């Protein structure tokens, strides 16, 4: 991420609308940005071609989309694919795509490490390193190869979702 720039990914429609109006842009620009972020899955503000060049330049001076590609993916013979994402805390989190006959599930993370230290889970053994932002949670869904075919998203990756309820609930609402 470019230093000093705020991230757009993870913001709600209301937050995007408030942001653009504070910059002197029309309210409908918030909806356009939301469509670019969450429907068209762009990686840069320059790709938002129905925004004027002046508005794209103004946004790009202060903001970045915030999408990041997985740093690694590993495919198993049953079709399950594990993705590894770098996050702002400097840690790494996993997302796992699980194909089935009539379903395509993505298991996503909500924290780097975990405080719970459950006996059956290795994540707790790593210790807790931080909560993911709503944007980092959403990025996992938008950035996997299979994202267009997903039928289910489950918060059963790294971390305890209810220990990061604010960002988890925001990621669901977006």
Regions found by a protein language model. Give the residues of each.
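Conserved Radical SAM active-site core
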Residues: 92-95, 101-174
């Amino acid at each position: 991420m470019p230093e000093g720039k705020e991230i757009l990914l993870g913001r709600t429609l209301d937050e995007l609308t408030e942001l653009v109006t504070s910059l002197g842009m029309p309210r409908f620009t918030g909806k356009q940005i939301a469509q670019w972020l969450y429907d068209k899955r762009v990686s840069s503000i320059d790709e938002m071609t129905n925004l004027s060049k002046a508005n794209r330049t103004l946004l790009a001076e202060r903001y970045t989309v915030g999408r990041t590609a997985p740093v690694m993916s590993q495919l198993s013979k049953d079709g399950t694919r594990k993705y590894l994402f770098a996050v702002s805390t400097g840690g790494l989190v996993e997302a796992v795509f699980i194909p089935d006959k009539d379903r395509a599930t993505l298991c996503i993370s909500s924290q780097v490490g975990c405080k719970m230290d459950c006996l059956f889970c290795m994540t707790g053994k790593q210790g807790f390193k931080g909560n993911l932002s709503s944007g980092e949670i959403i990025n996992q869904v938008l950035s996997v190869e299979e994202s267009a075919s997903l039928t289910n998203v489950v918060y059963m990756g790294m971390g305890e979702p209810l220990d990061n309820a604010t960002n988890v609930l925001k990621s669901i609402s977006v």
